[in-house]
Amino acid sequence: MSDDQHESIDGDETMEEDSMLAEGHEDGEEDVGEDEEEVETEESQGVPTTSEKKKPPPKKKKGGKKSSKKKNNCDYPDPYKSTSAEISAAIGLTDVDVDYEQEEFQSITNLKNFSSLVKPYILKVNPGTNVTKMYPLFQVKYKEFQDHMTAHGKSIQKQQRAKFVPVPVPVTPQEKIIPQKTRSSARRKRRDGSDGEGGGHDSDQEFEALIKQHEKQQDEAEKGKEEARINRAAAKVDKRKAALESARASKRARKEQGVVEENHQENCEVCNQDGELMLCDTCTRAYHVACIDENMEQPPEGDWSCPHCEEHGPDVLIVEEEPAKANMDYCRICKETSNILLCDTCPSSYHAYCIDPPLTEIPEGEWSCPRCIIPEPAQRIEKILSWRWKEISYPEPLECKEGEEASKDDVFLKPPRKMEPRREREFFVKWKYLAYWQCEWLSETLMDVYFTALVRMYWRKVDSENPPIFEESTLSRHHSDHDPYKLRERFYQYGVKPEWMQIHRIINHLSYAKSQQDYLVKWKELSYEHATWERDDTDIANYEDAIIKYWHHRERMLNDEVPRNVQKMIAKQREAKGLGPKEDEVTSRRKKREKIDILKKYEVQPDFISETGGNLHPYQLEGINWLRHCWSNGTDAILADEMGLGKTVQSLTFLYTLMKEGHTKGPFLIAAPLSTIINWEREAELWCPDFYVVTYVGDRESRMVIREHEFSFVDGAVRGGPKVSKIKTLENLKFHVLLTSYECINMDKAILSSIDWAALVVDEAHRLKNNQSTFFKNLREYNIQYRVLLTGTPLQNNLEELFHLLNFLAPDRFNQLESFTAEFSEISKEDQIEKLHNLLGPHMLRRLKADVLTGMPSKQELIVRVELSAMQKKYYKNILTRNFDALNVKNGGTQMSLINIIMELKKCCNHPYLFMKACLEAPKLKNGMYEGSALIKNAGKFVLLQKMLRKLKDGGHRVLIFSQMTMMLDILEDFCDVEGYKYERIDGSITGQQRQDAIDRYNAPGAKQFVFLLSTRAGGLGINLATADTVIIYDSDWNPHNDIQAFSRAHRLGQKHKVMIYRFVTKGSVEERITSVAKKKMLLTHLVVRAGLGAKDGKSMSKTELDDVLRWGTEELFKEEEAPVEGADGEGTSSKKPNEQEIVWDDAAVDFLLDRNKEEEGQDGEKKEHWTNEYLSSFKVATYNTKEADDADDDEDETEVIKEGTEEQDPNYWEKLLKHHYEQDQETELQKLGKGKRVRRQVNYASENMGQDWSAQNNQQQEEDDGSEYGSDNGELLQTDEDYEERRRRREERSEKLPPLLAKVNGQIEVLGFNPRQRKAFYNAVMRWGMPPQDLTQSSWQVRDLRNKSEKVFKAYSSLFMRHLCEPVVDNSDSFMDGVPREGLNRQAVLSRIGLMSILRKKVQEFEKFNGEWSMPETREKMLATAAQASVSNLPGMIKIKEEPIDIDETPMDVDQSNITKTEELASEVKVEEEPKAPRLPYKFNICDGGYTELHSLWINEEKVARNGKEYEIWHRRHDFWLLAAVAVYGYGRYQINFQDIMNDPKFSIVNEPFKQTGADPATNFADVKNKFLARRFKLLEQSLVIEEQLRRAAHINKQQSPDQVGQLAQHFSELEHTADAHVNIARESNNGNRNANAILHKCLAQLDDLLSDLKTDVARLPATISQVRPVTERLQMSERQILSRLVVAKDPDAAPSKPALPPSGPFITPLFNQNFTTIQPKFPSLFDCNLSPDDEPIDIEGSISAAVAEASRASSIAATKDEPMDTSDKDIPSTSAAAGSSYPRY
């Protein structure tokens, strides 16, 4: 080794020693004392001390150690020549033996690492030892460690002894240069004074002198280096400090200038956690206090820089100077190039005459364009209301006489030619936090500079070429005389509603001086969060009136002093009205204010009510007197007047009288439905002008403003912020009445329950009928002095609800529900009714409109009986026949099943299209809508409704149609579309503002809507439709009170015409029987107390009563079978014999029905028996014409009904009536399935809706019907007509104009003509079926809401929908790029569902040709054979049956209908014989999931069990195929798959087979077991299909897995397999009692467990490697929209429609060239060895470890070894593991 190398090693070791010394110095306090002694020694010897050198602490430690070594050098033996025992003895320590074979010593490469590792061993034996003294021992130990490792074959570079670097020393000629010696040897070598050679140059004295001289020179050199190093370090510190201070100063300056600084990071720089952080003032880093210094308790004050900035200085942002942009070569306005002015601050260029206004002189010096000098608005824009065009004229062109040259200024300032005025846009904007009065027009330039994003979003919603036109801009009724502010011209015609500019009230003020205030103004029809602050001198209409009203209220409530400027306003206003001074009015008012006795009855309405201009009806005044009487007695009240009698007005004026007469100051709480809040506000403003009413509704921000400004005059009485808390003080409350909704009662209970309420009014009090509701419980906890409940139906269902109302009113009196109901269990008795009235008398007041409104237009209710159509009769009889088992008394049908049958029959009475089968078979137009004539003729109610509505339309009447079925409303919409009527609709799904908008549109003057469709339940609450005078109850509700609520929407105060109510009842049906029962038994006992059919559980009517309802009219219905049955199109035959009793509604009968002038029977002399008989007394039967025109029909009907009630019912009635029909229908149904007697099809050749290929159908008909008279000539003629119709239809479709992309119709946004409901229906259909097919007319994909869309419009919307899915739009954006609203569309979820349904359908189609269309064809054949035998047994004259075998056709189910085996017509030729059990048909099905799921493991285990005739009873892959096929047919439901529909379909009956044994167990929840299993199984199949698709795509692009990704997995598997094979016999020996084998077995099992855990972890990471296939957009380097356009246009020959855009079906089914499937499968050694014989028995997995390993490997290899569909009928597949097999139950 050279000297240079020695020197390098010496230097490294010396630095290493220094670092060790520094480490040792920090470990103990004793070292500090030793360092001080060493410093004193150095000072005494003249060595520079640490303080003189100004060394940092590490250098101080180094110097101190050097002195210590020098001082103690004589005591230590040489560490390079001594052992560790000697060094330990010399130091005074106990030696430690260290095992160098430990794993932690194998990576040691230097002394420092070795010392840190050995130090704990030494300190453990020698506690408290100074670490500095251990260093020699470390050196010796390290030398021994190196020798030990070298002896064991591992070479470690040995530590070299340190050497000095020679320093040149000037010597005299006599002196001889001493050979170089190492410093350590020179220090440790002792001078021997007994050297015999004496003097000379080699003497010891001379050697010591040279050593001292050399050390002195070395110390001086080190001193110079140290000083230079200290100076450099100090300079760096000073530089960093200056940089930090400069950074702080710069930051403060930027902050003062308002420059937005970069935000600090949100997590700690050290621990990357959030919390309370210290922010650095010179960078963006943040730290926890504890992360900087664990001993720091408080953060430092003032400016603070983080450790990074202290060490490295502040971050310097290097800003690269961008090159100056060149100006445009053309004018930004006109795009011309000559004579342009260049902006000095931006790249824009302009002509001087293109600027608005034009320049008059050429600017000198630097010039900035209009875009640069336009000022930024001080406010933020809230929204853009409208825009308009603004014309800008150009200056006169430059004119030069001949021979004259234009000056340079003129050339620049004037255009060279005459230029037409140009147009620029102006935007009408609403400023945030400012009122609509401050809306302004802004130029397009300003908007483009400062609000680019807002403008861009605005253009997505409106047309950028045609300004929007609002309703107010087209009205001409406004005159400037009545509009001094020119509001219409300035605001209304540009989208501002007039109410938005009208002051509702002032809610607060701020005073700057005695006569200067700002007011917080709340605007009409805007929520409180839009309230704005306005100055008192702002010019706003009626602003002074609002200010005066505000101060009057404060004066009345607080006796607050009115400011002088407001007093001047008041005096000026009174002087203009001719009134005297205000003081005189106050004095007179005090004199008149006398407290009136509350027991005094009002004979006339009081003056303060008359001052409002309103007049109360006498009955309303009586109601107020009654409420005042109840108040005086402390009796809580129920005001139960019939709807429309003004309960709102009576309750408000009652509270108003209490306040005006001084009985109470309030406050009052009114809880009402949200839909009626607006009506309450209007009535309070009209009847109670001095009431300060606060409407406490809205979102969280609005309610926060209300609590802060409207609850109390005391500042801080309510804590600000969104969190609701109790009010701090109840003094000086600001309001008299708080009007709120049921929801706010629950949400803001904290503050509302903390107020002491003088009275409570609950509107629609039947919300309190359930004492378990949240509303009931919360409201009971309020502190309320008096309660008033308002309800139009106090007894809606039963006495329990009435008890809950009384319990809320008087909980101390009504607290035992059981005793109450028991006492009134027999309400039908007169004395009990009287007792109930006496009990309710003090609490309830109820008047009827018939009793009190003698001057109000009357209402007349008629029962209109209609006939069943032929199609309805067919379905009616079919429902009864199909439910024969439930109807037959012998079979014990339940009450619930009978109620379900009644519901089905009611649907049939409404319209047969409510049934799915009739809906699918109904004639439809090309666009999918129902054919109009068939729609009307197939329902008897529609036939009459058509005639009635046409005459009502001609007479100028308007109609409300009520139905309790929303599906019926859908069909009624189709009816209105067919008839061309405009309509509105309200059902349970339409709430809030949409409901109110529909009502306002219908009630608007001149509204074109003729019909209003309402659901009975949703249409009976908070709706005023007095503009309609005709009510049609299409189907009666179970609860008649709901019908009363419904038609009261029209018959109420405000109605000017007589109201006609027509109740449709189908003759001879359950509807008629139910109506007749209600007509005779409408006392409280039948439908109120006992709840009847209105009860939810349906148990209040006995089975006998239900059976009586079902029997009504059935006998007559089935007697009509001798007449020919009409077809589905509703057209009868000419040979039909008319029924003499059939009701015929001709024109004369309809005119008589609609006659409003005829006198109502019994109108004068009839006296109402009791208020509970309102429903009964309102029933009137309409007069209609019959064939016999018998006037005594009604009497006969009544007599018959009464007699029928006393007759004993025949227990065999249903069996006699239906058994024969039931058997016939069973036979007919089975024949239609494909076996039995051939059914000749009845073909109507005159129909225009025949098949597409007429000639083919004609040929088929000729084959079936011999001797047909229709020849080919007729076929050709019809073919020609068909071609003509087809060409005409195509011409119309081509000429059809698409609706606009976005349009607003009736307040709703339409997209390509699709309203919100239709868009929702399209989305739901996509989520259920995937994307629609190409042939829309033949598809069942379309839903009802989309049938009226043409094919062109439908495809256009489908294309738009897909284009939106392909847009890379942010999920939280409100609209797509074209402005279409997103409406919460989840792009990822929709695409996933479309892809999944596509994969699923493709998989089913792949194997459908092998497996057929029926899952269990043999079961179907058995059913056909049974039907054939039943048909033979019913033949007349049957004597004997030949017993001969029947040939069973075992061909697949896709055979032609003509090849099906036929049943002979004669009984003697019928063959019946017990056939042997047919073999189960083979099948094929496979999913190649690559072993990534447990699907194949389950299949192997299941198919071992599914043998020997158990192919249907054990679930396996056959069932999985049929489950997928069923999902492909039925699709997804709203949230999940509806497995009930699948299990009810006979085609998929195999799905039910595995559950039959479970269903027999009564302790098992049968439905729950099935649904859970099917959901779990389908989820597994879904995952497998997705993985197969990923594998297919990976193989299609030759994607291979990297060996590194599966290498670790293969290694772990090899170790697992090796361990298992090596210990195969251990388990057997352990069972024989070998203890050693038992210990080895436990150790082996533990090792296997670890290996399996690692293997599971590796397998879990494998599917992620498949997802690494690059997306299509990345592989094609195209955006999603470009790919979509390529697929649509198909200009590329490779992208032709005939070629699929995706890879082929599956790599394991149709292999492609150069495909390598093995590279995308897991490479396990056992993957390719899975062949077992068919006779192999299931392996006993618990008995052998190796068996488990082998089966686990085989389970993941099934899909990898097959390239074709798997035919499991020919061979068996090996079993899977026990774990996989036991994860599913074996059904």
Curated annotation (Swiss-Prot):
<dbReference type="GO" id="GO:0042393">
    <property type="term" value="F:histone binding"/>
</dbReference>
<dbReference type="InterPro" id="IPR027417">
    <property type="entry name" value="P-loop_NTPase"/>
</dbReference>
<keyword id="KW-0238">DNA-binding</keyword>
<dbReference type="GO" id="GO:0003678">
    <property type="term" value="F:DNA helicase activity"/>
</dbReference>
<dbReference type="Pfam" id="PF00271">
    <property type="entry name" value="Helicase_C"/>
</dbReference>
<keyword id="KW-0067">ATP-binding</keyword>
<dbReference type="GO" id="GO:0016887">
    <property type="term" value="F:ATP hydrolysis activity"/>
</dbReference>
<dbReference type="Pfam" id="PF06461">
    <property type="entry name" value="CHDII_SANT-like"/>
</dbReference>
<dbReference type="InterPro" id="IPR012958">
    <property type="entry name" value="CHD_N"/>
</dbReference>
<dbReference type="GO" id="GO:0001709">
    <property type="term" value="P:cell fate determination"/>
</dbReference>
<dbReference type="InterPro" id="IPR002464">
    <property type="entry name" value="DNA/RNA_helicase_DEAH_CS"/>
</dbReference>
<dbReference type="InterPro" id="IPR000953">
    <property type="entry name" value="Chromo/chromo_shadow_dom"/>
</dbReference>
<dbReference type="InterPro" id="IPR023780">
    <property type="entry name" value="Chromo_domain"/>
</dbReference>
<keyword id="KW-0677">Repeat</keyword>
<dbReference type="GO" id="GO:0040027">
    <property type="term" value="P:negative regulation of vulval development"/>
</dbReference>
<feature type="compositionally biased region" description="Basic and acidic residues">
    <location>
        <begin position="192"/>
        <end position="243"/>
    </location>
</feature>
<keyword id="KW-0378">Hydrolase</keyword>
<keyword id="KW-0863">Zinc-finger</keyword>
<feature type="domain" description="Helicase C-terminal">
    <location>
        <begin position="944"/>
        <end position="1107"/>
    </location>
</feature>
<dbReference type="GO" id="GO:0006338">
    <property type="term" value="P:chromatin remodeling"/>
</dbReference>
<feature type="compositionally biased region" description="Acidic residues">
    <location>
        <begin position="1190"/>
        <end position="1199"/>
    </location>
</feature>
<dbReference type="InterPro" id="IPR014001">
    <property type="entry name" value="Helicase_ATP-bd"/>
</dbReference>
<dbReference type="InterPro" id="IPR038718">
    <property type="entry name" value="SNF2-like_sf"/>
</dbReference>
<feature type="region of interest" description="Disordered">
    <location>
        <begin position="1120"/>
        <end position="1141"/>
    </location>
</feature>
<dbReference type="InterPro" id="IPR009462">
    <property type="entry name" value="CHD_II_SANT-like"/>
</dbReference>
<keyword id="KW-0539">Nucleus</keyword>
<dbReference type="Pfam" id="PF08074">
    <property type="entry name" value="CHDCT2"/>
</dbReference>
<dbReference type="Pfam" id="PF00176">
    <property type="entry name" value="SNF2-rel_dom"/>
</dbReference>
<dbReference type="InterPro" id="IPR009463">
    <property type="entry name" value="DUF1087"/>
</dbReference>
<dbReference type="InterPro" id="IPR012957">
    <property type="entry name" value="CHD_C2"/>
</dbReference>
<dbReference type="GO" id="GO:0000118">
    <property type="term" value="C:histone deacetylase complex"/>
</dbReference>
<feature type="compositionally biased region" description="Basic and acidic residues">
    <location>
        <begin position="1761"/>
        <end position="1773"/>
    </location>
</feature>
<dbReference type="Pfam" id="PF00385">
    <property type="entry name" value="Chromo"/>
</dbReference>
<feature type="domain" description="Chromo 2">
    <location>
        <begin position="501"/>
        <end position="583"/>
    </location>
</feature>
<dbReference type="Pfam" id="PF00628">
    <property type="entry name" value="PHD"/>
</dbReference>
<dbReference type="Pfam" id="PF06465">
    <property type="entry name" value="DUF1087"/>
</dbReference>
<dbReference type="InterPro" id="IPR013083">
    <property type="entry name" value="Znf_RING/FYVE/PHD"/>
</dbReference>
<feature type="zinc finger region" description="PHD-type 1">
    <location>
        <begin position="265"/>
        <end position="312"/>
    </location>
</feature>
<dbReference type="GO" id="GO:0140658">
    <property type="term" value="F:ATP-dependent chromatin remodeler activity"/>
</dbReference>
<dbReference type="InterPro" id="IPR016197">
    <property type="entry name" value="Chromo-like_dom_sf"/>
</dbReference>
<dbReference type="InterPro" id="IPR001650">
    <property type="entry name" value="Helicase_C-like"/>
</dbReference>
<dbReference type="Pfam" id="PF08073">
    <property type="entry name" value="CHDNT"/>
</dbReference>
